[in-house]
Amino acid sequence: MKQNYILSIILCYLLANVHSAPAIITVWQTVTDAQVAAGPTAAAPAANANANVQQAAAASAPAPAPVASPAAPAPASSAPQSSTPSSSGWLSNLFNSFFGGSDSDSSSGSDTASAAPASTSPQSSSSSSSSSGNSFLSFLSGLFGSGSSSSTPSSISQQQQQQQGSPASGSNSPNSAQPDAAAASNPVPQSNNNQGSGLGSGFGSGFGSGSGSDSDSGSGLPSASSSTIIQQQPSSSNIGSSSTSSSSSSSSSSSSSSSSSGDIYAAISQCDGIDASFASEILDAHNKYRAQHKVGDLSWDVDTYNYAKNNADNYDCSGVLTHTHGKFGENLAAGFKDGASTVAAWVDEPISYSDASFVYNHFTQVIWKGSTKVGCAYKDCRKSNWGLYVVCEYDPYGNVIGQGSKNVFP
């Protein structure tokens, strides 16, 4: 009676834990997964555990189903396999184990548990103490030995093939492709100025920076970023007139339109919309004063004229004189009746020939030896009581700090 009571309790316990059987098989999967993760050194414990299971199964079942060799287990990243062991195999082993008293090795559960690494999936404790002792271990052996589990060698073999055929991690992943290092970049427009060494050393204190990409007149010509200018507006002897001069930031290339034969007027006829009489008059006025200071004549130039004309055409006749800070030397004036009187006003400024006290102004630009070409234009502002607005551009530019004594003579 007592034996039947104990048997009933054990049977109820086992029936209540029938659904734990897949979890026990998951423990075996974890063992084989650990072998994949740890390499050949982890294969020995898994093999020993499997040998113990097969040894215990041999005592209770004459023809156990083969178990896949741990030498080529399923990949560690594979999902747990669904396993539905048949009740005809393990249930008969259950009764045989209770009534037959199999002497299986009690270390199989502990070996299995010790070989299994820490896992994030919950596992049943196969090594816990049980009231059935060795009989319960025989029950475990029956599960592995004679059950017709769906985790067949063929399914494990397919997983082995997938593992062998899969590429190495990250070796062929599109995400590992590096972006093209050659990033397209927009080129910065280059200014076509040729600065001399004198500009870099000059235009120090007392002079404002004249950098800028466009002139106030709307000119689209490029300008250097390191230009410096002289911003002075001395009053002229004529009432209501004012003038200002500028040294631009860069020297321009020689204009092909300038006369190579020495005819300083040749380029006048090549200019569009020009007042030829005004051009000849203002050119002569420049060269008159240059001759007095022992420097060569200026020649009329198409490029400087076009630049000056663009400035003059966009002037608003306000009487405010604003330099364009372009690539040429520049003199401005407003309130005069013609070109000759304009140049006379520029020349009527004080001048010093000493390096220590040299003054850069309109006058020094007019007679600057290094400047060889000029182009001038005007806008009629007499309706606004400002006479003619006159613009003259010089190439190469003058008024370079530190170069005064080499370009301006008594």
From Swiss-Prot:
Give all residue intervals belonging to the SCP domain. 283-394
Any Gene Ontology biological process: sexual reproduction
Here the segments flagged for biased composition (Low complexity) are 148-179, 212-260
The reply on keyword Ligase is: no
The induction comment states:
Expression is specific to in opaque cells, in presence of lactate, and during hyphal growth. Expression is repressed in response to alpha pheromone.
Which portions of the chain have biased composition (kind: Gly residues)? 197-211
Tell me the leader sequence span: 1-20
Question: Does the record's keyword annotation contain Secreted?
Answer: yes
Q: Where is this region: Disordered?
A: 64-86, 102-132, 148-260
Q: Which GO terms describe its cellular component?
A: extracellular region; extracellular space
- Subcellular location, principal: secreted
**Localized where?**
Secreted
Which keywords appear in this protein's UniProt record, sorted alphabetically?
Answer: Secreted, Signal
Task: State the disulfide connectivity.
Answer: none
The UniProt family comment states: Belongs to the CRISP family.
Q: What does this protein do?
A: Secreted protein that acts as a virulence factor during infections.
The protein's name in its UniProt record: Secreted protein PRY1
